[in-house]
Amino acid sequence: MSGTHRVDADTLEPAHISARKGRLMDNRGAATVEALIAKGVEIPNPSTVDITDDVNPDLISAEGVVIHPGCRIRGSRTVISSGSILGAETPMTIENCRLGRDVELKGGFAQDAVFLDGASMGSGAHVRSGCLLEEQANGAHTVGLKQTILFPFVTLGSLINFCDAMLTGGTSRSDHSEVGSSYIHFNFTPDGDKTTASLFGDVPRGVLLDQPPIFLGGQGGAVGPVMTGFGTVVGAGAVLRADVPDDGMLVLPEAPAGVNRPVETASYRKLAAVLAKNITYLGNLSALESWYRQVRRLFLTRLEYGDAILAGALDCLASARAERIKRLGRLIEKVRPDTPERQELVDNRAEFLAALTVADGPAPAHVIRKFGAASGDGVEYLDAIATLNDEERHDVTAWLSAIVAEQHRTAAQTIPALSAQF
């Protein structure tokens, strides 16, 4: 009879509806979606969520997690902690990312990245491997990151490309380092090199969350590698091409003079400075790794999935180090040995790169005892940092500065000419 449908005897539904439901429940990850819903995860439109078979549902919290329509979740190392929300603005894809508590990724793509408690990114995010966003670090819409480390509270505007950089500074969500909209960190040279990682602030002071914020004005950029002190203010529309070593400086760089001459490839006129800045960056990575292993560990490991998140952060730091060493190795391969110093670098390439492994040093015992007691009492990490007195802050900075200095020393042992750069 026209307009009628056969009824499925088992479900008492029209057969075409029953068949469509069957196809939907055959979607990849359907069983995982069902398991997540059963344990309390909010998934408003389950049939639109794609979860690969290697995702472990036991690493996704049941408390306050929301996965909006169209999201894709991939990777055996993926962790989603309580209160985290995916895809509130547009679909979000995450692959092997570790999310702390109350993370909001509103739309885009993230892979092999770590987001600590309260970190957030707006729609259009493109966060690639080696990125570590610490507590409440955030970006608005259409932000591209790779091998980027943002300290707590750092805020990025919209339409930003900020790869191969570490940004520290600031004390709170109302007193934070900021990158203005339409900012670019230029990290690729005409010679095809990426020995361009820039350090805004530093680790030995930055971890204490008591330094003036850094402001990089919108519609501007930085030509890596550059380094700045805390409290640096770079005006909107400016392109930073030189270091700002002193703290608290207002910078409005002049436009470079016009040039029209033949290109000289692989000249590396500032080779020693480029090498030194990369070594300093590696030294700060070493200092941050020591901080995570000896201090952060005390607070992370007590949390749900904290061990996995700590491992992810250490993976990011290892990835950042490997990237910097790889890029240095490729640059040295192109250096012409036309001076004694360059000949020494070329001849000692392997020894130099081997000297760039992680530097370390023991934390002050009294500081570790204080942090351990705070963690045992349930004090949050950010609150514990605020309790340090002046002596303890001095000792933390001295400890981490010594690690940076050790990185300098071991590198200069293989290339003595570099010692003058530090």
Language-model regions: role of each:
Residues 1-213, 219-221, 230, 243-248, ...:
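Domain-scale signature associated with acetyltransferase and cell-envelope carbohydrate enzymes
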Residues 235:
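Cys/His-rich Zn2+-coordinating "finger/knuckle" modules used by eukaryotic regulatory proteins
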